[in-house]
Amino acid sequence: MGSDVRDMNLLPPVSSLSGNSSCNMPVSSSAQWAPVLDFPPGAPYSSLTPHSFIKQEPTWNPDPHEDQCLSAFTVHFSGQFTGTAGACRYGPFGAPTPSQATTGQARMFSNAPYLSNCLDNQQGMRNQGYSAVAFDGTPSYGHTPSHHTSQFTNHSFKHEDPLSQQTSLGEQQYSVPPPVYGCHTPTDTCTGSQALLLRTPYNSDNLYPMTSQLDCMTWNQMNLGSSLKSHGTSYENDSHSSPMLYNCGGQYRIHTHGVFRGIQDVRRVPGVTPAIVRSTEANEKRPFMCAYPGCNKRYFKLSHLQMHSRKHTGEKPYQCDFKDCERRFSRSDQLKRHQRRHTGIKPFQCKTCQRKFSRSDHLKTHTRTHTGKTSEKPFSCRWPSCQKKFARSDELVRHHNMHQRNMTKLQLAL
């Protein structure tokens, strides 16, 4: 399985912000560990451990954008946050009290539209080292996103290269999708036994996130889906809340290991294979589903899905080593069957007529001609008043052609 490894070092915070002076964000010189997200009220979370995990999986809800491709990968990050005070909070939880502004914990992801009373514009904020990267998206808690509409679609965010943070060469501008909606509360955070879930659909035209969501969930490898759903139920009936991500005066590091979906995606990034999507509990018998657009095939094993994904990517790693034969195959068993053409080996023999075959499915089809059982002739003629059955599909095709020729002759005679 291929991987996409990104190493993002955000710009260090500065001691002052442009804009409204009411935004008070003192920054300490010593690095401190702080929670990454805000979470819903009443969540029994303590502090987030320095080393935490974000497991990215596709949303369980129907994707309204059919042209987007799902991705599934794990993000491991460790963060050092230097901001000692909470940022200006606006939205469903209201503005912070003076005590919260001085004793609150550092927050993650500043964004000018969310903090319009604190910052004059997003560009000024970006130049000062804030909002170096932001993942934005629409809510997905089992309800339609009609309550949360996109308000800022023309902004952009950047990825700062640690080697050239002070130059324009380290800056890549990407289009920012609608605002992020996550779980937040001014005081509660996640514990080390829990995890943060990041769900991001990817568009096949580019490899950068179009929408994403950060959620808190109990870390349970056996049942991740139900934990997430139970966590988001408190928001299903809240039609007026519009939770926002908050400002963080900090520096952190993200390491991602993942896979992407889509033909265009895979061809643009060498060594990257399509995404692997775990299904919900309703499909536990075939838990591995292909996430390629328009393909919903499911498999018992992960290896089977990986082999299937090569049909979409066009990857053929197995090559015939016989002289003057350069044919390539996506699966090892296909190569093995092909090589029997060169060697002449036919390991499968009919016990009735002793005829040999190079493939087991060919032998199975052949044995139906001996038994004559209706149950072993699955191909039925659908021509009116014809009830013949055949053991092989090619026999049925020839039979249909016979009907067609007879009909043509009859029409010409009339």
From Swiss-Prot:
<keyword id="KW-1017">Isopeptide bond</keyword>
<keyword id="KW-0677">Repeat</keyword>
<feature type="zinc finger region" description="C2H2-type 4">
    <location>
        <begin position="379"/>
        <end position="403"/>
    </location>
</feature>
<dbReference type="InterPro" id="IPR000976">
    <property type="entry name" value="Wilms_tumour_N"/>
</dbReference>
<dbReference type="GO" id="GO:0008270">
    <property type="term" value="F:zinc ion binding"/>
</dbReference>
<dbReference type="Pfam" id="PF00096">
    <property type="entry name" value="zf-C2H2"/>
</dbReference>
<dbReference type="GO" id="GO:0072013">
    <property type="term" value="P:glomus development"/>
</dbReference>
<dbReference type="GO" id="GO:0008285">
    <property type="term" value="P:negative regulation of cell population proliferation"/>
</dbReference>
<feature type="zinc finger region" description="C2H2-type 3">
    <location>
        <begin position="348"/>
        <end position="370"/>
    </location>
</feature>
<feature type="cross-link" description="Glycyl lysine isopeptide (Lys-Gly) (interchain with G-Cter in SUMO)">
    <location>
        <position position="55"/>
    </location>
</feature>
<dbReference type="GO" id="GO:0000122">
    <property type="term" value="P:negative regulation of transcription by RNA polymerase II"/>
</dbReference>
<dbReference type="GO" id="GO:0044729">
    <property type="term" value="F:hemi-methylated DNA-binding"/>
</dbReference>
<dbReference type="GO" id="GO:0000981">
    <property type="term" value="F:DNA-binding transcription factor activity, RNA polymerase II-specific"/>
</dbReference>
<dbReference type="GO" id="GO:1900207">
    <property type="term" value="P:negative regulation of pronephric nephron tubule development"/>
</dbReference>
<dbReference type="Pfam" id="PF02165">
    <property type="entry name" value="WT1"/>
</dbReference>
<comment type="function">
    <text>Transcription factor required for development of the vascular component of the pronephric kidney, the glomus; may repress tubule-specific gene expression in the portion of the pronephros fated to form the glomus. Recognizes and binds to the DNA sequence 5'-GCG(T/G)GGGCG-3'. Inhibits Wnt-signaling during embryonic development. Function may be isoform-specific: the isoform containing the KTS motif is less effective in inhibiting wnt signaling.</text>
</comment>
<dbReference type="GO" id="GO:0016055">
    <property type="term" value="P:Wnt signaling pathway"/>
</dbReference>
<dbReference type="GO" id="GO:0005737">
    <property type="term" value="C:cytoplasm"/>
</dbReference>
<dbReference type="GO" id="GO:0030178">
    <property type="term" value="P:negative regulation of Wnt signaling pathway"/>
</dbReference>
<keyword id="KW-0217">Developmental protein</keyword>
<feature type="site" description="Important for interaction with target DNA">
    <location>
        <position position="389"/>
    </location>
</feature>
<keyword id="KW-0694">RNA-binding</keyword>
<feature type="region of interest" description="Important for interaction with target DNA">
    <location>
        <begin position="332"/>
        <end position="346"/>
    </location>
</feature>
<dbReference type="InterPro" id="IPR036236">
    <property type="entry name" value="Znf_C2H2_sf"/>
</dbReference>
<keyword id="KW-0805">Transcription regulation</keyword>
<dbReference type="GO" id="GO:0039004">
    <property type="term" value="P:specification of pronephric proximal tubule identity"/>
</dbReference>
<feature type="zinc finger region" description="C2H2-type 2">
    <location>
        <begin position="318"/>
        <end position="342"/>
    </location>
</feature>
<dbReference type="GO" id="GO:0006357">
    <property type="term" value="P:regulation of transcription by RNA polymerase II"/>
</dbReference>
<keyword id="KW-0879">Wnt signaling pathway</keyword>
<dbReference type="GO" id="GO:0016607">
    <property type="term" value="C:nuclear speck"/>
</dbReference>
<dbReference type="InterPro" id="IPR013087">
    <property type="entry name" value="Znf_C2H2_type"/>
</dbReference>
<dbReference type="GO" id="GO:0061440">
    <property type="term" value="P:kidney vasculature development"/>
</dbReference>
<keyword id="KW-0832">Ubl conjugation</keyword>
<dbReference type="GO" id="GO:0003723">
    <property type="term" value="F:RNA binding"/>
</dbReference>
<feature type="short sequence motif" description="KTS motif">
    <location>
        <begin position="373"/>
        <end position="375"/>
    </location>
</feature>
<dbReference type="GO" id="GO:0010385">
    <property type="term" value="F:double-stranded methylated DNA binding"/>
</dbReference>
<protein>
    <recommendedName>
        <fullName>Wilms tumor protein homolog A</fullName>
    </recommendedName>
</protein>
<keyword id="KW-0479">Metal-binding</keyword>
<keyword id="KW-0238">DNA-binding</keyword>
<feature type="cross-link" description="Glycyl lysine isopeptide (Lys-Gly) (interchain with G-Cter in SUMO)">
    <location>
        <position position="158"/>
    </location>
</feature>
<feature type="short sequence motif" description="9aaTAD">
    <location>
        <begin position="217"/>
        <end position="225"/>
    </location>
</feature>
<feature type="zinc finger region" description="C2H2-type 1">
    <location>
        <begin position="288"/>
        <end position="312"/>
    </location>
</feature>
